[in-house]
Amino acid sequence: MGGDSVIQQPIRRSRQSAIRLFAQEYSDADLPEEGSGEYDPSFVITKLGAKVNRALVGGVIDRLERREHESGLTFTGHIRDPTGVHLFNVASFQPELHPDIEELLHRFEKGDRFLMLLVGRARWFETDDGGVFTSFRAEEFTVVDKDRYTHWLVDTAAATLRRLDAFEASMESDLTPAALEASGVPRDLVDGLILARGHYGEFDTENYRVGVLQGLSIALGSNAVIESAPAPEASGDQPTLSESVTEADDGGVAS
């Protein structure tokens, strides 16, 4: 399919770098930061201080479906990594991605389960009671083999450990840029850590370290890459999170 060529296209310099992170860190995040101007980037700030505008995520395709709306076709899917599930969508105003996602949908509906890498832009949906649910709008994606997925796991584990180390260093420091840098926090993580520490307070980082170990265990071949994990069916007439995020994309609630 054309997916391989899609993800290898050069990224425009104006784009934010794609951060590597596991699903648990992203799904735990509930701190959005909207850009002050029309063209300023928006971010989701994770507990470890990652400022996520764009991310490179990976895992097993767990769910994929097509929906028809007045504005056109949309697609939503789940990618499962060792720590949890990323929700992503392809919007109606992205027709250039529709042929490739249709091909993946055809494979998925035949029972095929495959490994994917996806570059997506951070999105969030805010509920009436103040809850925040995160997702990605797909920009580029491709099906990958186990070796390429293993490289992603190792790189993502290293990136997560770097944020964990920076977070631990920040706990012994004043929350000022100069003090954090003096404590060994990398400059690119300072702003995010100040925002994260001010919003989330103290929390146990052990789950994130376990997630890193789970990822490395799969990379080393100790655990299976693809395991069956059927997605729960939605009950009643309440919209699913996938539907809510799709409606937000069409209607404008998000980053």
Give names to the regions the model predicted.
Residues 1-51, 211-220, 238, 242-246, ...:
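OB/S1-fold single-stranded nucleic-acid-binding modules
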Residues 64-69, 121-127:
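Short beta-strand micro-motifs enriched in acidic
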Residues 58-60, 78-80, 119-121:
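Residue-level recognition of well-ordered beta-strand positions that form the cores
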Residues 52-71:
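Structural detector for short beta-strands of small beta-barrel domains
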Residues 66-98, 136-147:
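OB-fold (S1/OB) nucleic-acid-binding surfaces
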Residues 41, 94-105:
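Short acidic (Asp/Glu) patches
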Residues 100-121, 127-243, 252-255:
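Extended, charge-rich, solvent-exposed interface segments
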